[in-house]
């Protein structure tokens, strides 16, 4: 299973082609659009999300509500393109027209791809870099993840997310499954404790008023995974390695951990390893889940717990110092419309990126041409956990 996205932030549309989805999977576009809507929300979002109405159009690979087994193409229209048609269109424009529109960027923003991307691809107008490196591309990745969540639901695998920390203000590290699921999306910062939610809003407002931005930590949980997905045999087949690569490929994500993560370094092994237990109903299970459902690069049947660290968004309304690439003079960096905090939205993006990595790993483990075949193999693997 793989996908390829295309499109620029202010171009006409984002397009994604997904290959490897089994045939006969029931897909409703409203299910995908419901997930797309979640990405647009969250306290601290900028004006761009008031312009866009992200909805997906499926243009191939699905017929009469069911996948065909062929590549699935989805399109997300950029409504803001109406204001950028001339500058972002494919047709050539004159230097005079470009200058009159004041859209050329020569002052790179610290923390963005602007300067290094301009060097790498020889772009003197850094808009050519920022348009593709923008987090707008994550809308297409959420569409892919939403499709994967439909697949996972058919396999009785649940995936959900929350915010753990914003700007140094922390929610509890872990909640039991029922509390977690019962409180999803209860507020606009996606934390479970309402008192902490208000403190986070105040912190976001403070950053916005200062022309600054703040980051945080998000958590994704995958429940009811069959055992043995991934492999200890080769480095590139380890499930935690694949999930980690997916998470840190999200714009502004700078770290990832599993289970107790970096706190494991503070404790002795006797407090971190999860003891193995058995009963006839569950089969093998663990007495705790400090390792986050992963052992030896494989799922062990316990919930997979993924923690992702997002740095503050580098576009600031109180811009940092930079250098004009044409004149080499010191300037304040270019200001582009942006969010003061995108951590709540990033938790949704992270959830869908993990959903893709899980679905991809499952389809490699249980190679299937159609959904019925895949379901049967999953049933057999779950039974193995009891009978082994």
From Swiss-Prot:
Its EC number is 4.2.3.5. NADP(+) binds at residues 39, 45. GO terms for biological process: amino acid biosynthetic process; aromatic amino acid family biosynthetic process; chorismate biosynthetic process. GO terms for molecular function: chorismate synthase activity; FMN binding. It catalyses: 5-O-(1-carboxyvinyl)-3-phosphoshikimate = chorismate + phosphate. GO terms for cellular component: cytosol. Its cofactor is FMNH2. FMN binds at residues 132-134, 251-252, 296, 311-315, 337. Keywords: Amino-acid biosynthesis, Aromatic amino acid biosynthesis, FAD, Flavoprotein, FMN, Lyase, NADP. It is an enzyme of class 4 (lyase). The keyword Flavoprotein applies. Pathway: Metabolic intermediate biosynthesis; chorismate biosynthesis; chorismate from D-erythrose 4-phosphate and phosphoenolpyruvate: step 7/7. The keyword Flavoprotein applies. Pfam families: Chorismate_synt (PF01264). Reduced FMN (FMNH(2)). It comes from the Bacteria. PANTHER family: CHORISMATE SYNTHASE. This reaction introduces a second double bond into the aromatic ring system. HAMAP family: Chorismate_synth. Belongs to the chorismate synthase family. Homotetramer. This is Chorismate synthase. It comes from Staphylococcus aureus (strain bovine RF122 / ET3-1). The lineage of its organism: Bacteria, Bacillati, Bacillota, Bacilli, Bacillales.
